[in-house]
Amino acid sequence: MKEQEITLSEILSAREERVALQNALLEQYRVPVISFTMNMAGPVKLTALSHRAFAWGIEQLRLGFSQNKFSVLAEQSRSLPTGDEAYFAVDALAERVKALCVEIEESSVAGRLYDMDVIGLDGKKLERGVERPCIVCGEPGRGCASRRVHTAAEVREAGDRVLEQALFLHDRAEISRLATSALLEEVSVTPKPGLVDRANNGSHRDMDFSSFQASAAALVPYWAECFGIQNATCKVQNEGTDPSTTLRSAQDDRRRTITPAETFAALRPIGKQAERDMLAATGGVNTHKGAIFTLGVLCGAIGRRWTAREGFPSVDIILDEAAAMTRETLEQELPAAHWNTAGEALYRQYGTRGIRGEVADGLPAVREVSLPVFRAMLAQGLDRNHAAAVTLLHLIANVEDTNLLHRGGPAGAAWAREQAAELLFPACHSERSEESVPPAASLEKRTDSSTSPRSAQNDRQETLMPKAAELILGSRVPSLQEIAELDRQFIQRKLSPGGCADLLAVTLFLDSLPTEL
């Protein structure tokens, strides 16, 4: 957003227009009117920071209207060089409306810069009652303003710090909410072949729907911590720096001093703690270990590329950053692994790198398959449950899932891919099976230790990852009844595509992530 300096004449003209709009709403609806603007010092009244904070303020007002059962008869908003403006004609007692506005102004970090005037039926503004403190020194604000104690630059800098902090806290909480919502939505998608859903426990005997709910609840703080890890790491490395440094400057410093691999290293101990929290919540059952890794890395990647002015980065930037964070560590550690986990054992036996390799490659299964397929299904009119169930089939048909490989061996994993492909591409299944489902022989136990696992994986991905457009245009949409029948077959064979379930959760998370407020 380009910042533009305005003149005193423009400020006065905008003020007159606001009064005219307020009076017009009062006359038309005969109810109290809220006039919402931002208190921005200096000649620049509209910035990227103020615009994002203003949008958040509107969200808070709408939530307050709903919670208090206030009826909004009219709403108008506009973004001008003189600042953002919003007007609400609210059918409620003016005193109650003012109380709501004061509560928002005082409870929100950004609220110090909110100017939520309430105009009563007599055309007069209701007073706050308690004077607001100065944003720079904390003394009574009117005294500082009348005596010009602080320069406009000082007030502007203090205001920017407030907005940056407020937007960081808001977006950190939003990341946690969206990640938790994605986990709950994923387990709720029904039917899912071999997986826990609302209908049954899939091929599992040690977990059920409530296990996943308990696990998701236990992980709520983890996602926020991952998003904020960059700030925490920077704070440790830069103790003793000038406390007046703005969050924006600190972000620039972080990108210069903390590498992607170092961010990943900082994430690992809190990921281990999240696993312990999950096990404590589920009685020792592993419900979300894969998601703790994958979504945790993504939340950390978002935190690395987040700015208060721009908000969340694009999906491509997030996935590229996740790859940069994990690739170096994977290349160093996986060949030297001690085979303590099932994934490491499968790497030694078949050369498959599992979810760690998928993340290190930038999650191509999500970028090229599941996310475009899911959005295409929604565009075709499917509800989110059906769209997600179909998306899961595309993942099963196109991803080398180590959970399937662990439970069913090469033959079981190949069978699962074939069945999913048959539902999606029945007319050309025989041809597609040869092209997109690697034969069991390609996953035979590795005997040549000189074979490059990464090259082998990339070779398979060229086959397993057809263009999303081809997937969408060439496939049919299986019914929920057909998917439920496949669920029964997976359960009978004790197969569970847990890796694909994690990728579905990632898909739902990224789809819900706003790239701008």
Model-based region annotation:
Residues Q492, S496-L517:
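Short, amphipathic C-terminal "tail helix"
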Residues V33-D91, M207-F212, A217-Q230:
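Short, well-structured hydrophobic secondary-structure segments
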Residues A224-A232, I258-R304:
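Long, hydrophobic/aromatic-enriched structural stretches that serve as scaffold segments
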Residues R161-I229, F264, I302-F425, A468, ...:
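Phosphate-rich cofactor/ligand-interacting catalytic cores and adjacent structured alpha/beta frameworks
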Residues M1-G64, R96-A99, E103-D122, L126-F168:
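Long, contiguous binding/interaction regions
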Residues M1, Q230-I258, F425-V477:
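Intrinsic disorder/low-complexity segments
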Residues R276-K289, A379, R488-P497:
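A short glycine/serine-rich beta->alpha loop
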Residues V102, E106-V109, Q273-D277, F293-E321:
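A generic, well-ordered mixed alpha/beta core segment in the N-terminal half of proteins
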